[in-house]
Amino acid sequence: MRLIDTLMRLSAAEEFFEVLAVPYDPAVLRVARLHILRRMGERLSGTDLAALPDGAVRALARSALEAAYAEFTRTRPIDARVFQVLKTARHPRGRSFVPLSSLRR
């Protein structure tokens, strides 16, 4: 089986790290697993991996995974805004203060 086929069958983030022999901290992966895999996919998009030999696929995929993982060791997923729902989210301006004296029974 070709490496690209193996990668296509993986379902857990940990499996990608194991197959590509990339060390990781489980605490980082627990918080940012989907963001890391999404960013890896973005880095590989536009590359026809199926046309490449296994060695090239391994090198490209490993490099993309390492770069994506490194990004999320430095930044929080909410700040990276990888997913559309986070891209369009707005930070709240501040909390409104409602004094207790203004509340009625």
Swiss-Prot record:
Transmembrane feature ranges: none
Cleaved signal peptide residues: none
Keyword rRNA processing listed: no
InterPro entries the UniProt entry points to: NifW
Keyword vocabulary terms for this entry: Nitrogen fixation
GO biological process: nitrogen fixation
Function: May protect the nitrogenase Fe-Mo protein from oxidative damage.
Assembly mode: Homotrimer; associates with NifD.
Family membership: Belongs to the NifW family.
Protein's name in the database: Nitrogenase-stabilizing/protective protein NifW
Phylogenetic placement of the source organism: Bacteria, Pseudomonadati, Pseudomonadota, Alphaproteobacteria, Rhodospirillales
